């Protein structure tokens, strides 16, 4: 009888040993699987300075942004002045992101047009488009080929007008968007500026409307910006506006030109508005300044309203510009967002984050993360800009860690930084999933393009409601990882 406790103890120890061996085998197999499926195994830790080589760019080309902006005009057909392959790529990229068919025309360059210029192609295209599709506006954007040739789009459009190819009450606008410079964000900015250059007029009679240029954001974000203005009782002109264009409902009836988008009449009246709020310096600033110069409409350039502070600034600017008060509904939304931050702060605190995306989005997102005591330490954008780097340095000045900023940078450098200094969370577009898988890091999809999930065109990330959704996505990623890695004795039901 005296030996039974010792025998039982030995059995317990043997059983625990078996469990530990089993756990070690499982861990080893999991690591082995990860090693054998490394998708970016060529990425080295050693960082070599590169000036003339980009590996896995953190951006896409200007015409994609120009095409997206053009879709924000009601009854507009974007037109790619270049080869068929260029247009097919631009359309397919937007279609994969939005899961909606994106319509656009092309000048269909052949060898002859590539040598002698695309004037004949564009004049014929303008005639065909108005005859067959009857849009209100054709928005022409250039490509590498047509820019290299030196095609003069205003002159070609003028010839089409003189030849009677453009019907009365119809319009052809253009933006110069060569792919070998800038990015999709600068392409968006150029086409938005073209809307002002071609349409904005001043009658000398000021209206009570506020112009809002939303920046390169999702249709859901544009919808949310409009909703906030409506809640506050402010009359606005939002341009461009892709809501109800690239997130339109399924009605069972095909429409070449959906109901959404800013109308030509609204664009023409932007020159009489009280003021302009430009959200995002890079994507919206140029158009806002052009309105100020051409029509004397004063402008204020704000950060994208992502996160608590940036949304506060937007709501306050809207309140001051329209001389209205903030309604209780908006105050309630703000309080709910603040409540989430307060309740779950322990899970945000001190977490290191790596971000990649567009400059305007990264500025607001970095500020938001810092405000909830997270630490953005690797920040990469494919769009060059010294002002961006300066602003990020200001935002992350009190982060107790070295902060790496790539502007311009690429995904290869982004991955190298992460290898050398691991993080707790990744945020970026769908291409970041390869890094997330190889390095086994929680990942939140944010930005453009997102081709492997749905919801970004329907659920906003701007405003207080959008901020709550962003907090939820960040928390889900962090807490899912905590659940996955917690040993049995600390696997919690309530967090």
Residues covered by each model-derived region:
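An N-terminal assembly and electron-transfer interface module characteristic of large anaerobic redox
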Residues: 1-495
């Amino acid at each position: 009888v005296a030996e039974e406790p010792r025998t039982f103890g030995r059995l317990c120890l043997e059983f625990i040993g078996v469990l530990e061996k089993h756990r070690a085998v499982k861990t080893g197999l999991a690591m082995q699987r990860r090693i054998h499926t490394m998708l970016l195994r060529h990425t080295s830790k050693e960082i070599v300075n590169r000036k003339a080589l980009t590996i896995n760019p953190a951006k896409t080309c200007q015409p994609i942004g120009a095409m997206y902006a053009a879709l924000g005009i009601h009854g507009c057909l974007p037109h790619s002045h270049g080869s068929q392959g260029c247009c097919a790529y631009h359309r397919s990229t937007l279609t994969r992101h939005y899961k909606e068919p994106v319509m656009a025309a092309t000048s269909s360059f052949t060898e002859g047009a590539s040598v002698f210029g695309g004037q004949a192609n564009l004049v014929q295209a303008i005639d065909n488009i108005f005859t067959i599709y009857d849009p209100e506006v054709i928005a022409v954007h250039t490509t590498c080929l047509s820019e290299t040739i030196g095609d003069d789009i205003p002159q070609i459009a003028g010839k089409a007008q003189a030849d009677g190819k453009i019907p009365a009450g119809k319009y052809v606008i253009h933006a110069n968007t060569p792919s070998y410079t800038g990015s999709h964000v600068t392409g968006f900015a150029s086409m938005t500026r073209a809307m002002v250059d071609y349409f904005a007029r001043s009658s000398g009679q000021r209206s009570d409307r506020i112009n809002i240029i939303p920046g390169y954001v999702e249709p859901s974000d544009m919808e949310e910006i409009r909703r906030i203005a409506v809640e506050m009782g402010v009359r606005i002109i939002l341009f461009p506006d892709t809501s109800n264009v690239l997130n339109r409902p399924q009605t069972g009836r095909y429409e070449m030109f959906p109901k959404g988008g800013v109308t030509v009449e609204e664009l023409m009246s932007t020159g009489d508005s009280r003021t302009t709020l430009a959200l995002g310096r890079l994507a919206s600033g140029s158009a806002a300044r052009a309105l100020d110069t051409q029509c004397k409409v004063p402008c204020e350039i704000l950060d994208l309203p992502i996160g608590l502070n940036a949304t506060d600034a937007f709501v306050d600017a809207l309140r001051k510009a329209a001389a209205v008060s903030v309604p209780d509904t908006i105050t309630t939304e703000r309080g709910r967002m603040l409540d989430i931050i307060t309740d779950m702060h322990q899970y945000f605190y001190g977490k290191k984050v790596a971000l990649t995306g567009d400059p305007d989005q990264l500025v607001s997102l970095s500020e938001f993360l810092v405000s909830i005591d997270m630490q953005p330490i690797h920040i990469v954008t494919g769009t060059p800009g010294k002002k961006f780097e300066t602003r990020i340095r200001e935002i992350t000045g009190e982060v107790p860690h070295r902060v790496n900023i790539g502007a311009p940078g690429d995904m290869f450098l982004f991955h190298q930084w992460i290898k050398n200094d691991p993080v707790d969370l990744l945020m970026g577009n769908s291409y970041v999933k390869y890094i997330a898988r190889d390095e086994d890091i929680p990942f939140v999809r944010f930005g453009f393009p997102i081709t492997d999930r749905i919801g970004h065109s329907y659920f906003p990330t701007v405003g207080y409601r959008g901020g709550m959704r962003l907090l939820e996505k960040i928390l889900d990623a962090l807490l899912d990882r905590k659940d996955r890695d917690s040993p049995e004795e600390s696997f919690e039901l309530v967090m």
